[in-house]
């Protein structure tokens, strides 16, 4: 599991997976409700000419993201589902890959330089697919030398960070798929990436238990190496203001760093259980951690401490 099964759209609204469902949790009402059930057949409501849309069922969700009211989820059999949170039904669903090991490892939603919304998927078949965010037609398909575990678009929509079963991480042009830079430094396979909101810093998480920070203005080597406690770095998130960065290990540990201190100041959150995902609220005041452990399954909320002067604790 690649640990991206949780997304906060506000300080009070969190979307997370539970069995064959995506649930919405309201921290204000202290209630949860089901917004998507994939145990039953899911029929797309949009089916424009040339669309790849098809019915899917019993989807085991492998990854998820939410942006601008659009939720995109991927499945273990190559499924992709797109649902507008303010509309009934699922707008689009299909199997983008049909290989035996075609898991959808990563999905992202971004706006290209002209402002058009794009949905991007990364699969174990070594392909990255770019879909139109309006009609969900496939616009581009990029092939890489290895299974792609994670993909993320830069804030300006011009670059894609492509990570997978290789120690090297790639930066590719989002329009053409052409590799523009090869990032070397990690020792094992990579699983996570995130862009600082200013677009200059890319963070990559690896099975070598480190997160490396790269400055896109000088990619000759990483500018920082942040170490985890004992496991691979499986998820990375920045706050919307860029002040904090969080990274999660497969289980038990989430690390929060203060970017203003050049990542020197931080806090380690020690918990019990497998980590399903991490997400900051858009206002940067809350950090949510999903725990998928059978015994300790839960959703944890950490609130940012506010003081007149900076003290030791961040969250």
Model segments located where?
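Structured C-terminal portions of repeat-based eukaryotic scaffold domains
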Residues: 184, 194, 200-315
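WD40 beta-propeller repeat fold
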Residues: 1-166, 170-172, 182-184, 227, ...
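Active-site cradle of extracellular carbohydrate-active enzymes
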Residues: 165, 179, 206-207
């Amino acid at each position: 599991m690649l640990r991206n099964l949780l997304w906060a759209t506000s300080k009070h609204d969190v979307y997370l997976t539970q069995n064959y469902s995506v649930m919405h949790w309201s921290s204000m009402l202290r209630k949860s409700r089901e917004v998507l059930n994939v145990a039953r057949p899911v029929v797309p409501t949009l089916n424009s000419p040339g669309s790849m849309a098809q019915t899917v069922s019993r989807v085991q969700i492998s990854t998820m993201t939410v942006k601008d009211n659009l939720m995109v989820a991927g499945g273990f059999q190559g499924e992709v589902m797109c649902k507008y949170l303010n509309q009934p039904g699922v707008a689009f669903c299909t199997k983008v890959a049909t290989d035996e090991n075609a898991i959808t490892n990563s999905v992202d939603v971004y706006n290209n330089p002209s402002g058009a919304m794009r949905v991007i998927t990364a699969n174990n078949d070594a392909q990255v697919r770019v879909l139109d965010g309006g009609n969900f037609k496939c616009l581009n398909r990029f092939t890489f030398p290895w299974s792609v575990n994670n993909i993320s678009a830069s804030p300006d929509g011009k670059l894609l960070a492509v990570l997978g079963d290789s120690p090297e991480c790639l930066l590719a042009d989002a329009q053409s798929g052409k590799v523009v830079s090869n990032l070397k430094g990690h020792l094992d396979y990579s699983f996570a990436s995130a862009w600082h909101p200013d677009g200059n810093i890319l963070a990559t998480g690896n099975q070598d238990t480190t997160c490396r920070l790269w400055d896109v203005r000088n990619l000759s080597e990483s500018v920082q190496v942040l170490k985890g406690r004992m496991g691979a770095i499986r998820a990375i998130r920045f706050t919307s203001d860029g002040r904090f960065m969080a990274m999660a290990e497969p289980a038990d540990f989430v690390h929060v760093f203060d970017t203003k201190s050049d990542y020197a100041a931080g806090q380690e959150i020690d918990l019990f259980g497998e980590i399903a995902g991490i997400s900051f609220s858009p206002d940067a005041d809350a950090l949510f951690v999903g725990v998928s452990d059978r015994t300790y399954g839960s959703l944890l909320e950490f609130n940012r401490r506010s003081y007149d002067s900076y003290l030791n604790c961040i969250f």
